[in-house]
Curated annotation (Swiss-Prot):
Native source organism of the sequence: Ligilactobacillus salivarius (strain UCC118)
Active site residues of this protein: 137 (proton donor/acceptor), 165 (schiff-base intermediate with substrate)
Location(s) in or outside the cell: Cytoplasm
Protein name: 4-hydroxy-tetrahydrodipicolinate synthase
InterPro entries: Aldolase_TIM, DapA, DapA-like, Schiff_base-form_aldolases_AS, Schiff_base-form_aldolases_CS
Pfam families (alphabetical): DHDPS
Length: 290
């Protein structure tokens, strides 16, 4: 399944049980809730999914469960990137062996801090040798390096690099959209830019806020498409402070607390991320109005 009709992707949390183990049952409940409430595609095993603290066996089980529970309703993207090129290829191909995965999200290599030449070499090799379409993940706040727009434009010419999740601002999203092939998927990774990204011609948003406000976001995009820009803007203005609140503590602790609050139990976080205490939860819930 392709992503052409998927404008709102949820970067899904990984549900744990009360003992902190991965929970297949809670994953099923969460996926059904998300798909009933505005989500048009899923990203699993990403930053919000606490991928760095999942074992490979847990990741693969999460992916298999996600394919099963999605049951062909929406496209599925899986985080497979690392700062080791060969390891990224090997793991991406292991994920590709699971029928029902539609693309791999590959983060710009972190910690090693490659230059633009190194980034191009990394992504070309990953794209050449991977059995899944590749989507670049450009998030300098977490990687320590920024993939420049010219580099993105160059990589967008590769047949197996089909899109980007970009977290560098609307100016760069505008430049990317203007200069890449028409079928290249440009997603913002910043909830506050969800409307701007779409107005600028991007595909949409890979969102955390859609865990809680997916229906609102879908209404926002529908309003935009029907020409009701005023309503779309109103929804976005209401969403921005709530999206900010969902990052008021290290992610995904706020969104997990919010999901637990509204009745979709996803457990807590794994160290080094700590779950919110009661005072922090109460402060968050006031901001979220839940």
């Amino acid at each position: 399944m392709n992503f052409r009709n998927a404008h709102i992707l949820t970067a899904m949390v990984t549900p744990f049980d009360d003992e902190g183990n991965y929970s297949s049952k809670r994953t099923k409940n969460l996926i059904n809730y998300l798909l009933d409430n505005g989500t048009e595609g899923l990203l699993v095993s990403g930053t919000t999914g606490e991928a760095p603290t999942l074992s490979e066996d847990e990741k693969l089980q999460l992916i298999k469960d996600s394919v099963k529970f999605i049951d062909g309703r929406v496209p599925l993207m899986v985080g497979t990137g690392s700062n080791n090129t060969q390891q990224t290829i090997d793991y991406t191909n292991k994920v590709a062996d699971i029928d029902g995965v539609d693309a791999a999200l590959v983060v710009v290599p972190y910690y090693n801090k490659p230059n633009q030449k190194g980034m191009i070499a990394h992504f070309r090799k990953v794209a050449d040798y991977s059995n899944l379409p590749i989507i670049i993940y450009n998030i300098p706040g977490r990687t320590g390096v920024t993939m420049e727009v010219d580099t993105i434009i160059e990589l967008a010419q590769h047949d197996n690099i089909i899109g980007i999740k970009d977290c560098t601002g609307v100016e760069n999203i505008a430049k990317i959209v203007e200069n890449v092939p028409e079928d290249f998927l440009v997603y913002s990774g910043e909830d506050a830019e969800a409307l701007s990204a779409r107005v600028l011609g991007g595909q949409g948003i890979i969102s955390v806020a859609s865990h809680i406000y997916g229906d609102n976001m879908k209404t926002m995009y529908s309003s935009l498409e029907s020409g009701d820009v005023s309503m779309a803007g109103k929804i976005m203005r209401d969403l921005i402070p709530k999206a900010e609140a969902l990052f008021s503590y290290p992610s995904p602790s706020p969104v997990k607390a919010a999901l637990n609050k509204i009745g979709y139990n996803v457990g807590g976080c794994r160290l080094p991320i700590v779950s919110l205490d009661k005072n922090e939860e109460n402060e968050l819930f006031k901001k979220l109005k839940i």
